[in-house]
């Protein structure tokens, strides 16, 4: 794409010749992502002016927003950093990073650091991954220096890239920038490093039609129902280029197993449903091996090296969407359901409307997806518009969050002031934990401030919170109290006395409506 390359070079030159921009900007590890968003601005505006509906191939263009480094640091520190302190509460990490509600005692079973995984399912050019690399590096050094862990400093870059950080995005160019950024970081830490296997992948890969590989699965003695499930999953995988990490693979098998368990609850255990459960567990174990074999066999039969690479990417994608993570971070795309194109709407309604309605906005589907991708004690850290906090159509989202997660820290930012001036959006950022917790949830309310004052106010209020100093912008509330008001709006700042009024009967229940 020579024209696009020329545009990128011109963009670099404009910045380099701008006397108001300091030289230090070129030392920032997220400079590539920042430039890429600037490069896309004209295309974004053209799409916005077209008034077209947002289809899968325009999601990145329509809603790709560069996440400022301070936001990334806050979210990663309070998810990955806090998870580490839950295992090592006496670590020096708590003195070096600003982590809210840092535990004083061990709250989590110790897990080897090289087994802890973080994913960004809409990673763009990799801002979250780049900072996660830095924090993971510090955690490894803490393990070596203070906990006698059996790691060597020279191995840390490879451990982080091949074991700890994962990312998926629809945008192939953004993924290339994310991979390049991580490679540069690894090279800075160890200049001789080579042959890294990245778990950062574009879902824009190629798969053949199922008919071309079906014989691999036919040798597995599948039932007709299982054969149909294989075809459905293959189709989902084949069209991952449209929907990226929102595609569900392993969940379809798990849903089938759960339906058998529900049948057992209703009808009791018998030989047939016991065999069904055993069959599906065996099916699950062999399915992914067969799927990988099918992809590899197809790739090896082709002489086109590019096609082989793009087909092999499917194996990495399959692995990433099928495993569980300790932390999921995201600044997901924002698109209201009224702006969905036909294909996108059909996919979202099919996969994210039941049993809870997460189909009202694209960012809401990523809340659900991050929950699904994390393990039973995982953490979720996200930034996106705050519309889900109050609007009726997001009631199911709020109910899901309150029923199934613990709100650790929540910042209601408000309109403007978080992202660059061209991103005219409301924002909120928060950290959720899937592990049960009886502690009060912490909130910060900044949305009524003038946008230019929010950043400084945030820093002061956050420092006050960490130092247990009263601040009018900070609030704590038992999460259960957010369920008192009908439809569960996140109204966290009112007094208990006022909140209790919502427990009493409403006017329509107390008065009889009469005619005449």
What label would you give each PLM region?
Residues 106-109, 154-156, 316-319, 400, ...:
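Short, flexible, glycine/charge-rich loop motifs used to bind or transfer phosphoryl groups or to couple energy/partner
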Residues 136-143:
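Post-Walker A helix-loop "phosphate-sensing" segment adjacent to the P-loop in P-loop NTPases
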């Amino acid at each position: 794409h020579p024209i696009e390359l020329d545009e990128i070079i011109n963009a670099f030159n404009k910045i380099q010749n701008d006397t108001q921009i300091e030289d230090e900007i070129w030392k920032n590890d997220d400079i590539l992502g920042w430039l890429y968003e600037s490069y896309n601005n004209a295309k974004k505006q053209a799409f916005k002016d077209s008034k077209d509906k947002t289809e899968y191939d325009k999601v990145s263009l329509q809603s790709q927003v560069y996440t400022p480094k301070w936001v990334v640091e806050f979210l990663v520190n309070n998810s990955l950093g806090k998870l580490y302190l839950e295992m090592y509460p006496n670590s020096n990490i708590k003195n070096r990073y600003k982590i809210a509600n840092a535990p004083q005692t061990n709250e989590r079973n110790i897990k080897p650091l090289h087994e802890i995984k973080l994913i960004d399912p809409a990673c763009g050019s990799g801002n979250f991954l780049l900072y996660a690399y830095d924090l993971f590096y510090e955690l490894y050094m803490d393990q070596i220096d203070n906990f006698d862990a059996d790691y060597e400093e020279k191995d840390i870059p490879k451990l982080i890239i091949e074991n700890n950080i994962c990312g998926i995005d629809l945008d192939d160019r953004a993924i290339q920038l994310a991979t390049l950024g991580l490679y540069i970081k690894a090279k800075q830490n160890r200049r001789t490093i080579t042959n890294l296997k990245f778990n950062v992948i574009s879902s824009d890969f190629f798969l053949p039609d199922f008919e071309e590989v079906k014989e691999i699965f036919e040798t597995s003695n599948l039932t007709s129902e299982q054969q149909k499930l294989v075809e459905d999953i293959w189709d989902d995988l084949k069209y991952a280029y449209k929907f990226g990490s929102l595609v569900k693979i392993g969940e379809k098998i798990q849903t089938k197993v759960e339906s058998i368990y529900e049948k057992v609850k209703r009808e009791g255990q018998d030989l047939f449903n016991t065999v069904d459960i055993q069959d599906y567990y065996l099916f699950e174990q062999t399915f992914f091996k067969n799927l990988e074999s099918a992809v590899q066999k197809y790739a090896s039969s082709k002489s086109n090296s590019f096609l082989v690479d793009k087909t092999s990417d499917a194996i990495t994608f399959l692995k990433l969407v099928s495993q569980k993570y300790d932390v999921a971070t995201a600044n997901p795309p924002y698109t209201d359901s009224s702006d969905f194109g036909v294909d996108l709407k059909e996919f979202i309604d099919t996969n994210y409307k039941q049993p809870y309605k997460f189909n009202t906005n694209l960012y809401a589907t990523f809340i659900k997806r991050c929950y699904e991708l994390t393990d039973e004690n995982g953490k979720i850290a996200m930034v996106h518009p705050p519309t889900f906090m109050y609007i009726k159509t997001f009631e199911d989202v709020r109910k899901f969050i309150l029923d199934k997660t613990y709100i650790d820290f929540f910042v209601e930012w408000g309109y403007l002031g978080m992202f660059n001036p061209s991103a005219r959006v409301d924002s909120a950022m928060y950290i959720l934990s899937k592990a049960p917790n009886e502690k009060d949830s912490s909130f910060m309310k900044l949305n009524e401030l003038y946008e230019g004052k929010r950043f400084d106010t945030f820093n002061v209020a956050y420092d006050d919170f960490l130092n247990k100093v009263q601040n009018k912008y900070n609030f704590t509330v038992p999460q259960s109290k957010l369920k008192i008001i009908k439809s569960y709006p996140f109204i966290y700042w009112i007094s208990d006395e006022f909140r209790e009024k919502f427990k009493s009967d409403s006017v329509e229940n107390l008065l009889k409506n009469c005619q005449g």
